[in-house]
A protein has these predicted regions:
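Compositionally biased intrinsically disordered regions enriched in Thr/Gly
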Residues: 21-282
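Sec-dependent signal peptide recognition
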Residues: 2-8
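Bacterial N-terminal signal peptides
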Residues: 9-15
């Protein structure tokens, strides 16, 4: 018997100028079972949420001196099996923070420390290179911010979709936002990919389906028309993205900003239903 309970953790929007104290808030208010498949003894649940709200101003004596803000709100998924819980924890640490063989808590701390150190180094280099005072580098363009949030939901076949959204501003015309995904098997905590659910040799056919779906979504009859409206696509079709989720009704393929279109398009989501994929599914 398959049981699906979906929890979506809403994104945290943060005001850059707000005063926050650095904290590691471990919340248990979201505790729930996400999915049970094939056996009622195999469960993944939301253990807690790691929350960080941290700011650092380069020079507190100057009101508009450059500053950095870091907002993190990410759920920790656990299993009844301690070894699986450890595997999940390290997998997320590697996926989100590129910290190998590290716990998620430790990876968060290292991320915050490194970003603040890099920010201070960057501002110091600006001052030293230009021979100016810190007051010459006030304003939005010299402020940094990092926001990391995550959504967790159960989907097709009881698999657990874990989607991370990162918002980054390190100077420039606008911030950048991108998503990364990972899918867990609730039975053993292993990751699940397209290779696990689609038949060998699926890539050419999947590329064709995605290309057709993209053209339909933007009312383009040909690849040339798609190119004319700004999409980055050639005669071989749209590439298969590395980020996707197994929804209840279909696979959602996620193209981050700049992957297949200019910034103004934002992220592009293409959904192929399982009926559309029936010839490719194992």
């Amino acid at each position: 018997m398959k049981k699906n309970i979906t929890i979506i953790l809403s994104s945290i929007l943060f005001a850059f100028g707000a005063e926050h104290a650095s904290a590691m808030n471990m919340s248990t208010e979201y505790d729930a079972t996400y999915a049970v498949t094939r056996t009622d003894t195999a469960k993944l649940s939301l253990d807690r949420v790691i929350e960080i709200h941290d700011t650092l101003q380069f020079d507190k004596t100057i009101e508009e001196a450059p500053s950095i803000a870091i907002d993190i709100s990410i759920p920790v998924v656990k299993s009844l099996n301690k070894d699986i819980s450890k595997k999940l924890d390290r997998t997320l640490a590697s996926m989100i923070f590129e910290e190998e063989e590290s716990s998620l808590d430790k990876a968060v701390q290292v991320f915050c420390r490194n970003r603040k150190e890099e920010f201070v180094l960057y501002i110091n280099e600006l001052i030293n290179d230009d021979g100016d005072n810190i007051s010459d580098f006030s304003g939005f363009f010299y402020n940094f911010f990092y926001g990391i949030t995550a959504d967790v939901e159960s989907g097709w076949n009881g698999y657990i979709n874990y989607t991370v959204t990162q918002e980054v501003y390190e100077g420039g015309a606008h911030p950048n936002s991108y998503k990364s995904t990972i899918i867990f098997n609730p039975i053993d905590g292993n990751t699940v990919t397209l290779d696990d659910i689609l038949k060998p040799g699926y890539k050419e056919a999947l590329t064709a389906l995605l290309t057709t779906k993209l053209l339909e979504q933007y009312n383009a009859k040909t690849i040339k028309e798609a190119q004319e409206i700004g999409l980055f696509i050639n005669e071989t079709g749209v590439p298969i993205p590395s980020n996707y989720t197994f929804g209840d009704n279909g696979i959602v393929f996620i193209y981050n900003t700049y992957e297949i279109a200019p910034y103004v398009f934002g992220a592009i989501h293409l959904t192929l239903t399982y009926d559309e994929l029936k010839d490719l599914l194992k």
